[in-house]
Amino acid sequence: MEYNETYFKKSANRKVMLIWVLIASILTIAYGIEYAKGGRELGYVLAFIAICWIPIVLSFIIVKIKGWENSICKETVTIGYGVTYAFALLTANTNISFVYIFPVISMLILYKDRKLIIRSGIYNVLLLIVNVVIRAVQNKITPTDVTDYEIQFACII
């Protein structure tokens, strides 16, 4: 069977969108549970859900207009999930939220686009740096946090 670029793009976009919807669904449920436990305010949870789902809806609109074989989808996934990830990371109550990047990196591998993965990796490292700087300015870094941040950078790089 020879390589068919149109088939590959359709297949990759469908798989990535399915995974993205599954991740967003899990995160929506998790943040809903967090609200129910009193860990987050309703406004925060609604903002998170909007930030999480609006890029997905926009991506499906693009797919409807341009077709499943379009090249724009991988960019909307990367940017959309990147915004969701940034919001979650920078507003998290825990240092473990950096792991939210792993599903998107796994999804992006389906595109077999090295430059896209490198750009995403650089974005992630910059976000981790921004997160550490913000926490340092707020004087919210403990010795345990320093170890956590070292582990985060080691995992990402």
Predicted feature residues:
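Alpha-helix N-cap/helix-start motif
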Residues: 97-98, 119
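Hydrophobic transmembrane alpha-helices and their membrane-interface boundaries in multi-pass
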Residues: 15-93, 100-107, 124-129
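Short, Lys/Arg-rich, polar N-terminal cytosolic tail immediately upstream
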Residues: 1-10
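Alpha-helical transmembrane segments and their interfaces in multipass membrane proteins
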Residues: 29-51, 110, 114-157
